[in-house]
Amino acid sequence: MPTPTSAPPAAPTDSELGRHLLTVRGFHFVFGALGDPYARRLRGEADHLSLGELVRDRGPLHGSALGTWVTADGGISARLLDDPLLGPRHPASEGPQEHVLENVWETWRTCHVTPLGEDLLTPAAADSDRLAALLGPVLGPRTCTAWQVDAGRAVHRVLDGLPPHFDVVSDLARPAIAGSLAAVLGLPDEARAELPDLLAACGPVLDSALCPPRLPVARAMTQALRRVRELMAAAVANHLTAPADGAVSALLAVDPGGGRDPGDTVTAAVLSTVVGAETAITTVANAVMALLKHDEQWSLLRADPGRAADAVEETLRWAPPVTLRSLITQGEVQIGGETLEADQHVVVLVDAAQRDPALYEDPDRFRLDRPRSPGFTHMALAGRDHLGLVAPLVRVQCTAVLRALAERLPGLRAEGEPLRRGRSPVVRAPLSLRLAQK
Protein backbone atom coordinates (compact mmCIF):
# COMPACT_ATOMS: atom_id res chain seq x y z
CA MET A 1 0.00 0.00 0.00
CA PRO A 2 1.51 3.38 -0.98
CA THR A 3 2.66 5.68 1.78
CA PRO A 4 0.31 8.69 2.05
CA THR A 5 1.72 12.14 1.49
CA SER A 6 1.97 13.99 4.79
CA ALA A 7 3.81 16.73 6.63
CA PRO A 8 7.20 15.81 8.12
CA PRO A 9 6.57 13.93 11.37
CA ALA A 10 7.53 15.36 14.71
CA ALA A 11 10.65 13.91 16.30
CA PRO A 12 9.68 10.73 18.16
CA THR A 13 10.03 10.57 21.91
CA ASP A 14 12.50 8.16 23.48
CA SER A 15 9.59 5.89 24.35
CA GLU A 16 8.24 5.89 20.79
CA LEU A 17 11.62 5.41 19.16
CA GLY A 18 12.77 2.78 21.65
CA ARG A 19 9.58 0.76 21.19
CA HIS A 20 9.94 0.88 17.40
CA LEU A 21 13.61 -0.15 17.44
CA LEU A 22 12.90 -3.06 19.78
CA THR A 23 9.94 -4.22 17.70
CA VAL A 24 11.88 -4.31 14.44
CA ARG A 25 14.83 -5.98 16.15
CA GLY A 26 12.41 -8.57 17.50
CA PHE A 27 11.22 -9.27 13.95
CA HIS A 28 14.79 -10.02 12.94
CA PHE A 29 15.30 -12.50 15.75
CA VAL A 30 11.93 -14.24 15.45
CA PHE A 31 12.06 -14.78 11.70
CA GLY A 32 15.77 -15.52 11.83
CA ALA A 33 15.07 -18.27 14.36
CA LEU A 34 12.48 -19.63 11.92
CA GLY A 35 15.18 -19.92 9.27
CA ASP A 36 14.71 -16.85 7.07
CA PRO A 37 18.24 -16.15 5.70
CA TYR A 38 17.65 -12.41 5.20
CA ALA A 39 16.44 -12.04 8.79
CA ARG A 40 19.51 -13.98 9.90
CA ARG A 41 21.69 -11.50 7.98
CA LEU A 42 20.04 -8.62 9.80
CA ARG A 43 20.60 -10.38 13.13
CA GLY A 44 24.31 -10.14 12.39
CA GLU A 45 25.24 -13.80 12.08
CA ALA A 46 28.93 -14.15 11.33
CA ASP A 47 28.76 -16.47 8.31
CA HIS A 48 27.31 -13.82 6.02
CA LEU A 49 28.58 -15.38 2.79
CA SER A 50 26.90 -18.72 3.49
CA LEU A 51 23.66 -16.87 4.17
CA GLY A 52 24.07 -15.15 0.82
CA GLU A 53 24.36 -18.53 -0.86
CA LEU A 54 21.17 -19.65 0.90
CA VAL A 55 19.39 -16.60 -0.50
CA ARG A 56 20.69 -17.34 -4.00
CA ASP A 57 19.59 -20.97 -3.69
CA ARG A 58 16.00 -19.78 -3.15
CA GLY A 59 15.90 -18.33 -6.65
CA PRO A 60 16.76 -15.11 -8.46
CA LEU A 61 14.27 -13.11 -6.36
CA HIS A 62 12.23 -14.32 -3.42
CA GLY A 63 10.02 -12.93 -0.69
CA SER A 64 11.48 -12.85 2.80
CA ALA A 65 9.25 -13.46 5.81
CA LEU A 66 10.00 -9.83 6.73
CA GLY A 67 7.95 -8.63 3.76
CA THR A 68 11.02 -7.74 1.68
CA TRP A 69 11.97 -9.04 -1.75
CA VAL A 70 15.56 -10.27 -1.58
CA THR A 71 18.14 -11.23 -4.20
CA ALA A 72 21.73 -12.43 -4.28
CA ASP A 73 21.71 -13.09 -8.02
CA GLY A 74 24.44 -11.08 -9.74
CA GLY A 75 22.53 -10.30 -12.92
CA ILE A 76 19.25 -9.45 -11.19
CA SER A 77 21.06 -7.29 -8.63
CA ALA A 78 22.82 -5.23 -11.31
CA ARG A 79 19.54 -4.67 -13.16
CA LEU A 80 17.71 -3.61 -10.00
CA LEU A 81 20.38 -1.09 -9.04
CA ASP A 82 20.29 0.39 -12.55
CA ASP A 83 16.50 0.50 -12.90
CA PRO A 84 14.95 3.99 -12.56
CA LEU A 85 11.79 2.31 -11.26
CA LEU A 86 13.61 1.60 -8.01
CA GLY A 87 14.81 4.23 -5.57
CA PRO A 88 15.41 4.96 -1.90
CA ARG A 89 11.96 6.47 -1.17
CA HIS A 90 8.34 5.40 -1.03
CA PRO A 91 6.78 6.73 -4.25
CA ALA A 92 3.93 8.74 -2.67
CA SER A 93 5.74 10.07 0.38
CA GLU A 94 7.35 13.48 0.85
CA GLY A 95 9.86 14.49 3.49
CA PRO A 96 11.91 12.16 5.69
CA GLN A 97 11.10 8.48 5.29
CA GLU A 98 10.11 7.37 8.78
CA HIS A 99 7.91 4.56 10.11
CA VAL A 100 8.36 5.01 13.86
CA LEU A 101 4.74 5.93 14.56
CA GLU A 102 3.28 3.26 12.28
CA ASN A 103 2.06 -0.07 13.57
CA VAL A 104 4.66 -2.23 11.83
CA TRP A 105 2.61 -5.32 12.69
CA GLU A 106 0.09 -3.96 10.18
CA THR A 107 2.24 -2.11 7.65
CA TRP A 108 5.03 -4.71 7.74
CA ARG A 109 7.58 -2.02 6.92
CA THR A 110 11.10 -2.93 8.03
CA CYS A 111 12.80 -0.34 5.82
CA HIS A 112 13.91 3.17 6.90
CA VAL A 113 14.17 1.82 10.42
CA THR A 114 15.89 4.71 12.20
CA PRO A 115 14.75 8.31 11.64
CA LEU A 116 17.57 10.72 10.81
CA GLY A 117 15.42 13.83 10.67
CA GLU A 118 16.43 14.54 7.07
CA ASP A 119 16.61 12.92 3.62
CA LEU A 120 20.35 12.26 3.58
CA LEU A 121 19.95 8.57 2.64
CA THR A 122 16.66 8.98 0.78
CA PRO A 123 17.02 11.85 -1.70
CA ALA A 124 14.30 12.33 -4.29
CA ALA A 125 15.40 11.64 -7.86
CA ALA A 126 15.39 15.35 -8.72
CA ASP A 127 17.56 16.13 -5.70
CA SER A 128 20.04 13.39 -6.62
CA ASP A 129 20.24 14.67 -10.19
CA ARG A 130 20.84 18.22 -8.98
CA LEU A 131 23.60 17.09 -6.60
CA ALA A 132 25.19 14.98 -9.33
CA ALA A 133 25.26 18.02 -11.63
CA LEU A 134 26.90 20.05 -8.87
CA LEU A 135 29.49 17.41 -7.95
CA GLY A 136 30.36 16.41 -11.51
CA PRO A 137 32.74 19.30 -12.34
CA VAL A 138 34.52 19.07 -8.96
CA LEU A 139 34.14 15.67 -7.29
CA GLY A 140 32.78 13.61 -10.16
CA PRO A 141 34.15 10.44 -11.78
CA ARG A 142 36.24 12.41 -14.31
CA THR A 143 37.32 15.28 -12.05
CA CYS A 144 37.91 13.86 -8.59
CA THR A 145 41.44 12.68 -9.37
CA ALA A 146 42.47 16.35 -9.28
CA TRP A 147 42.40 16.02 -5.47
CA GLN A 148 44.80 13.07 -5.29
CA VAL A 149 47.74 15.19 -4.14
CA ASP A 150 45.75 16.83 -1.33
CA ALA A 151 44.46 13.46 -0.14
CA GLY A 152 47.92 11.92 -0.34
CA ARG A 153 49.57 14.66 1.73
CA ALA A 154 46.97 14.24 4.48
CA VAL A 155 47.47 10.46 4.53
CA HIS A 156 51.25 10.79 4.82
CA ARG A 157 50.83 13.13 7.80
CA VAL A 158 48.87 10.39 9.57
CA LEU A 159 51.51 7.79 8.73
CA ASP A 160 54.20 10.11 10.12
CA GLY A 161 52.64 9.82 13.56
CA LEU A 162 51.96 6.08 13.69
CA PRO A 163 53.60 4.15 16.56
CA PRO A 164 55.19 0.72 15.97
CA HIS A 165 51.92 -0.96 16.99
CA PHE A 166 48.60 0.60 16.01
CA ASP A 167 44.95 -0.09 15.22
CA VAL A 168 43.71 -0.30 11.65
CA VAL A 169 40.58 1.77 12.34
CA SER A 170 41.21 4.21 15.19
CA ASP A 171 44.87 4.94 14.35
CA LEU A 172 44.95 4.53 10.56
CA ALA A 173 41.71 4.44 8.57
CA ARG A 174 39.60 6.97 10.47
CA PRO A 175 42.35 9.62 10.93
CA ALA A 176 43.52 9.19 7.33
CA ILE A 177 40.04 9.55 5.89
CA ALA A 178 39.18 12.44 8.23
CA GLY A 179 42.40 14.22 7.31
CA SER A 180 42.06 13.69 3.58
CA LEU A 181 38.41 14.75 3.66
CA ALA A 182 39.27 17.97 5.52
CA ALA A 183 42.10 18.67 3.07
CA VAL A 184 39.99 18.08 -0.02
CA LEU A 185 37.00 20.08 1.19
CA GLY A 186 39.15 22.86 2.65
CA LEU A 187 37.62 22.72 6.13
CA PRO A 188 38.63 25.15 8.90
CA ASP A 189 40.59 24.06 11.96
CA GLU A 190 37.48 23.79 14.17
CA ALA A 191 35.90 21.25 11.87
CA ARG A 192 39.15 19.32 11.45
CA ALA A 193 39.48 18.95 15.23
CA GLU A 194 35.96 17.57 15.66
CA LEU A 195 35.87 15.39 12.57
CA PRO A 196 37.34 12.07 13.86
CA ASP A 197 34.92 11.85 16.80
CA LEU A 198 31.98 12.87 14.62
CA LEU A 199 32.85 10.21 12.04
CA ALA A 200 32.82 7.57 14.77
CA ALA A 201 29.45 8.75 16.10
CA CYS A 202 27.93 8.89 12.60
CA GLY A 203 29.35 5.48 11.72
CA PRO A 204 26.08 3.52 12.22
CA VAL A 205 24.07 5.74 9.84
CA LEU A 206 24.12 3.31 6.90
CA ASP A 207 23.41 0.30 9.10
CA SER A 208 20.57 2.07 10.88
CA ALA A 209 18.44 2.11 7.74
CA LEU A 210 17.84 -1.65 8.08
CA CYS A 211 19.13 -2.61 11.54
CA PRO A 212 17.89 -0.86 14.70
CA PRO A 213 20.72 0.53 16.82
CA ARG A 214 20.36 0.78 20.57
CA LEU A 215 18.46 3.90 21.60
CA PRO A 216 21.52 5.76 23.02
CA VAL A 217 23.45 5.01 19.83
CA ALA A 218 20.58 6.28 17.69
CA ARG A 219 20.34 9.51 19.65
CA ALA A 220 24.12 10.09 19.59
CA MET A 221 24.15 9.39 15.86
CA THR A 222 21.45 11.93 15.00
CA GLN A 223 23.06 14.51 17.29
CA ALA A 224 26.41 14.00 15.53
CA LEU A 225 24.70 14.29 12.16
CA ARG A 226 23.22 17.65 13.17
CA ARG A 227 26.66 18.83 14.29
CA VAL A 228 28.20 17.77 10.98
CA ARG A 229 25.60 19.81 9.13
CA GLU A 230 26.31 22.83 11.37
CA LEU A 231 30.04 22.59 10.67
CA MET A 232 29.55 22.19 6.93
CA ALA A 233 27.11 25.11 6.81
CA ALA A 234 29.67 27.27 8.62
CA ALA A 235 32.41 26.16 6.22
CA VAL A 236 30.26 26.99 3.20
CA ALA A 237 29.44 30.40 4.66
CA ASN A 238 33.16 31.08 5.15
CA HIS A 239 33.98 30.04 1.59
CA LEU A 240 31.17 32.23 0.24
CA THR A 241 32.69 35.34 1.83
CA ALA A 242 36.34 34.35 1.38
CA PRO A 243 36.92 31.76 -1.37
CA ALA A 244 39.91 29.54 -0.65
CA ASP A 245 41.55 26.32 -1.74
CA GLY A 246 39.39 23.25 -1.50
CA ALA A 247 36.39 21.57 -3.02
CA VAL A 248 33.87 23.69 -1.09
CA SER A 249 34.92 26.87 -2.91
CA ALA A 250 35.11 24.93 -6.17
CA LEU A 251 31.55 23.66 -5.68
CA LEU A 252 30.31 27.17 -4.91
CA ALA A 253 31.91 28.35 -8.16
CA VAL A 254 29.92 25.86 -10.24
CA ASP A 255 27.31 27.76 -12.24
CA PRO A 256 28.13 31.15 -10.63
CA GLY A 257 25.22 33.55 -10.79
CA GLY A 258 22.92 30.76 -11.92
CA GLY A 259 20.83 30.80 -8.80
CA ARG A 260 22.19 27.58 -7.36
CA ASP A 261 21.35 27.18 -3.69
CA PRO A 262 24.47 27.08 -1.44
CA GLY A 263 22.50 24.57 0.61
CA ASP A 264 23.31 22.00 -2.07
CA THR A 265 27.00 22.48 -1.35
CA VAL A 266 26.29 21.98 2.35
CA THR A 267 24.44 18.74 1.59
CA ALA A 268 27.24 17.55 -0.68
CA ALA A 269 29.76 18.16 2.11
CA VAL A 270 27.55 16.38 4.65
CA LEU A 271 27.19 13.40 2.31
CA SER A 272 30.95 13.22 1.86
CA THR A 273 31.44 13.41 5.63
CA VAL A 274 28.78 10.98 6.81
CA VAL A 275 28.24 8.50 3.97
CA GLY A 276 31.52 8.88 2.10
CA ALA A 277 33.78 8.74 5.14
CA GLU A 278 32.20 5.61 6.65
CA THR A 279 32.36 3.91 3.26
CA ALA A 280 36.01 4.89 2.82
CA ILE A 281 37.04 3.91 6.36
CA THR A 282 35.46 0.49 5.91
CA THR A 283 37.05 0.02 2.49
CA VAL A 284 40.52 0.90 3.79
CA ALA A 285 40.22 -1.47 6.75
CA ASN A 286 38.79 -4.27 4.60
CA ALA A 287 41.55 -3.77 2.03
CA VAL A 288 44.31 -3.92 4.63
CA MET A 289 42.84 -7.09 6.13
CA ALA A 290 42.45 -8.70 2.70
CA LEU A 291 45.96 -7.81 1.58
CA LEU A 292 47.58 -9.08 4.77
CA LYS A 293 45.68 -12.37 4.39
CA HIS A 294 46.82 -12.75 0.79
CA ASP A 295 50.60 -12.38 0.84
CA GLU A 296 50.99 -12.69 -2.92
CA GLN A 297 48.60 -9.77 -3.51
CA TRP A 298 50.29 -7.66 -0.83
CA SER A 299 53.61 -8.43 -2.53
CA LEU A 300 52.20 -7.24 -5.87
CA LEU A 301 51.13 -3.94 -4.32
CA ARG A 302 54.42 -3.44 -2.48
CA ALA A 303 56.32 -4.04 -5.72
CA ASP A 304 54.12 -1.55 -7.56
CA PRO A 305 52.25 0.92 -5.31
CA GLY A 306 50.71 2.31 -8.47
CA ARG A 307 48.33 -0.65 -8.32
CA ALA A 308 46.60 0.77 -5.26
CA ALA A 309 43.53 1.60 -7.34
CA ASP A 310 43.33 -2.06 -8.39
CA ALA A 311 43.43 -3.07 -4.72
CA VAL A 312 40.59 -0.67 -3.97
CA GLU A 313 38.45 -2.03 -6.81
CA GLU A 314 38.97 -5.65 -5.82
CA THR A 315 38.16 -4.80 -2.20
CA LEU A 316 34.93 -3.14 -3.32
CA ARG A 317 34.01 -6.46 -4.95
CA TRP A 318 35.45 -9.03 -2.53
CA ALA A 319 34.66 -7.25 0.77
CA PRO A 320 32.32 -4.37 -0.14
CA PRO A 321 31.80 -1.52 2.35
CA VAL A 322 28.04 -1.74 1.77
CA THR A 323 26.74 -5.31 1.69
CA LEU A 324 22.99 -4.62 1.56
CA ARG A 325 21.30 -2.11 -0.77
CA SER A 326 17.74 -1.12 0.14
CA LEU A 327 15.37 -0.06 -2.66
CA ILE A 328 11.67 0.75 -3.07
CA THR A 329 9.74 0.09 -6.29
CA GLN A 330 8.41 3.33 -7.78
CA GLY A 331 6.04 1.48 -10.11
CA GLU A 332 5.31 -2.04 -11.30
CA VAL A 333 8.53 -3.96 -11.95
CA GLN A 334 8.80 -7.33 -13.66
CA ILE A 335 12.06 -9.07 -12.91
CA GLY A 336 13.34 -12.50 -11.95
CA GLY A 337 10.06 -14.13 -12.88
CA GLU A 338 8.15 -11.96 -10.40
CA THR A 339 5.87 -8.96 -10.75
CA LEU A 340 6.49 -6.39 -8.04
CA GLU A 341 3.84 -3.75 -7.44
CA ALA A 342 4.71 -0.16 -6.60
CA ASP A 343 5.94 0.56 -3.07
CA GLN A 344 7.55 -2.84 -2.50
CA HIS A 345 10.77 -3.13 -0.48
CA VAL A 346 13.67 -4.83 -2.28
CA VAL A 347 17.11 -5.62 -0.84
CA VAL A 348 20.18 -6.58 -2.86
CA LEU A 349 22.76 -8.70 -1.05
CA VAL A 350 25.77 -7.01 -2.61
CA ASP A 351 28.48 -9.20 -1.10
CA ALA A 352 26.77 -12.38 -2.30
CA ALA A 353 25.86 -10.94 -5.72
CA GLN A 354 29.46 -9.90 -6.30
CA ARG A 355 30.55 -13.48 -5.67
CA ASP A 356 27.97 -14.99 -8.02
CA PRO A 357 29.84 -17.59 -10.13
CA ALA A 358 27.61 -16.67 -13.05
CA LEU A 359 29.03 -13.14 -12.97
CA TYR A 360 32.66 -13.65 -11.90
CA GLU A 361 35.30 -16.25 -12.64
CA ASP A 362 36.80 -17.69 -9.46
CA PRO A 363 34.67 -15.27 -7.40
CA ASP A 364 36.00 -16.18 -3.96
CA ARG A 365 39.58 -15.33 -4.86
CA PHE A 366 40.99 -11.90 -3.98
CA ARG A 367 43.14 -10.77 -6.92
CA LEU A 368 44.37 -7.35 -7.96
CA ASP A 369 44.62 -8.30 -11.63
CA ARG A 370 40.93 -9.15 -12.02
CA PRO A 371 39.83 -7.80 -15.43
CA ARG A 372 37.26 -4.99 -15.48
CA SER A 373 35.47 -3.25 -18.31
CA PRO A 374 36.00 0.52 -18.74
CA GLY A 375 33.45 2.49 -16.77
CA PHE A 376 32.56 -0.48 -14.58
CA THR A 377 31.48 0.20 -11.02
CA HIS A 378 30.80 -2.22 -8.21
CA MET A 379 27.30 -2.65 -6.80
CA ALA A 380 28.21 -1.17 -3.43
CA LEU A 381 28.72 2.25 -5.04
CA ALA A 382 26.49 1.98 -8.11
CA GLY A 383 23.43 4.09 -8.79
CA ARG A 384 22.34 7.71 -8.57
CA ASP A 385 21.65 7.84 -4.83
CA HIS A 386 23.85 8.86 -1.89
CA LEU A 387 26.37 6.06 -2.48
CA GLY A 388 26.85 6.81 -6.15
CA LEU A 389 27.35 10.50 -5.38
CA VAL A 390 30.24 9.91 -2.96
CA ALA A 391 31.88 7.07 -4.92
CA PRO A 392 34.55 9.12 -6.77
CA LEU A 393 35.95 10.73 -3.62
CA VAL A 394 35.83 7.41 -1.74
CA ARG A 395 38.00 5.86 -4.45
CA VAL A 396 40.50 8.73 -4.37
CA GLN A 397 40.82 8.62 -0.57
CA CYS A 398 41.19 4.84 -0.35
CA THR A 399 43.71 4.73 -3.17
CA ALA A 400 45.82 7.37 -1.41
CA VAL A 401 45.88 5.33 1.82
CA LEU A 402 46.78 2.00 0.20
CA ARG A 403 49.46 3.56 -1.98
CA ALA A 404 51.07 5.24 1.03
CA LEU A 405 51.01 2.00 3.03
CA ALA A 406 52.69 0.06 0.23
CA GLU A 407 55.37 2.74 -0.12
CA ARG A 408 56.10 3.35 3.54
CA LEU A 409 55.06 0.27 5.52
CA PRO A 410 55.99 -2.74 3.38
CA GLY A 411 56.59 -4.85 6.50
CA LEU A 412 53.08 -4.33 7.85
CA ARG A 413 51.58 -7.35 9.61
CA ALA A 414 48.45 -8.16 11.59
CA GLU A 415 48.48 -9.09 15.26
CA GLY A 416 45.41 -11.11 16.19
CA GLU A 417 41.98 -11.30 14.58
CA PRO A 418 39.75 -8.41 13.52
CA LEU A 419 36.67 -7.33 15.46
CA ARG A 420 33.58 -5.93 13.74
CA ARG A 421 31.00 -3.54 15.08
CA GLY A 422 27.80 -5.01 16.48
CA ARG A 423 24.49 -4.39 14.71
CA SER A 424 26.29 -3.71 11.45
CA PRO A 425 24.77 -6.05 8.83
CA VAL A 426 24.87 -3.40 6.09
CA VAL A 427 28.45 -2.15 6.42
CA ARG A 428 29.93 -5.01 8.46
CA ALA A 429 32.11 -2.25 9.84
CA PRO A 430 35.57 -3.20 11.13
CA LEU A 431 35.96 -2.12 14.72
CA SER A 432 39.56 -3.03 15.52
CA LEU A 433 42.62 -4.95 14.35
CA ARG A 434 46.06 -4.50 15.83
CA LEU A 435 48.81 -3.96 13.27
CA ALA A 436 52.57 -3.78 13.58
CA GLN A 437 55.17 -2.24 11.30
CA LYS A 438 58.50 -3.99 11.05
Curated annotation (Swiss-Prot):
Query: What gene is behind this protein?
Result: dnrQ
Question: What GO molecular function terms would the record report?
Answer: monooxygenase activity; oxidoreductase activity, acting on paired donors, with incorporation or reduction of molecular oxygen
> Family assignment?
Belongs to the cytochrome P450 family.
What SUPFAM superfamilies would the database entry show? Cytochrome P450 (SSF48264)
Task: Provide this UniProt record's keywords sorted from A to Z.
Answer: Antibiotic biosynthesis
Q: Which residues cross the membrane?
A: none
Name of this protein: Anthracycline biosynthesis protein DnrQ
* CDD domains tied to this protein: AknT-like
Carries keyword Zinc-finger? Answer: no
Tell me, what does this protein do in biology?
Involved in the biosynthesis of the anthracyclines carminomycin and daunorubicin (daunomycin) which are aromatic polyketide antibiotics that exhibit high cytotoxicity and are widely applied in the chemotherapy of a variety of cancers. DnrQ is required for the glycosylation of epsilon-rhodomycinone by DnrS to yield rhodomycin D.
Coiled coil feature spans:
none
Any one GO BP annotation for this protein = antibiotic biosynthetic process
NCBIfam families in the record: P450_rel_GT_act (TIGR04515)
